[in-house]
C-alpha cells in the first residue's frame, strides 16, 4: 500500500483535507503526519482561515482519533540530516520515519532535495495517482463525502467541481469516470 505524509498545507482547505482523509480511510493509501504537522495545520486554521480555537482543536482531535496510527514518532532525531528547505525538514524527517514514499504538499519547491525513494507530489498529482489505481474506491469515498455535507448540500459532481480549484487534473478524471457510471 502507498504510504504518504500529508504536509500541513494540504490539511488547511476543508474539501481537500476531507477528500484526502476519506480516501485514506477507504484504504487507498496510508496517511501519516507528525504532531508538528498537525500543530502547523491548527495554527494556520486560526491565523489564515479564522477558525475559532476550540473548533481547530476539536478538528485536530477528530483527525487523531480517526487515524490513531498515523502520527509519526522518532522524526526529531532525523530532522538535522535532511537537506531540503530548513522550514520543511521536519516533514521529510516524518516521511523517513514513517517509511513513506510520497509527501503530499502544495509547496513542491521546498522539497527538491529529499532522500532517495521519497517524492513530493501536489495534491492533484497524488489524487490522480490514487484514482488511477482504484477509481471505484475513490469515487465511492467522494460520493460518501458529498452525501455527508448539509450546509451547503453538494452532489458528487458539485464536490468534484469544487475540488478542481486545488486538483484540476484529478477533478477532470473523476468527472469523466462519474459520467461513465
Where are these regions (language model features)?
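PIN/NYN-family metal-dependent endoribonuclease catalytic core
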Residues: 3, 14-48
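Asp-based phosphoryl-transfer active-site loop
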Residues: 3-9
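Alpha-helix/helix-capping structural signal
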Residues: 9-10, 36, 109, 125
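Conserved beta-strand segments of alpha/beta enzyme cores
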Residues: 30, 71, 117-119
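PIN-domain endoribonuclease scaffold, especially VapC-family toxins
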Residues: 32-75, 142-167
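Active-site neighborhoods of divalent-metal-dependent phosphate/nucleic-acid chemistry enzymes
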Residues: 68-102, 153, 169, 178-181
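Acidic, metal-binding active-site segment of PIN/NYN-like and related structure-specific nucleases
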Residues: 89-121
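Acidic, PIN/NYN-like endoribonuclease modules and their adjacent C-terminal/linker elements
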Residues: 109-181
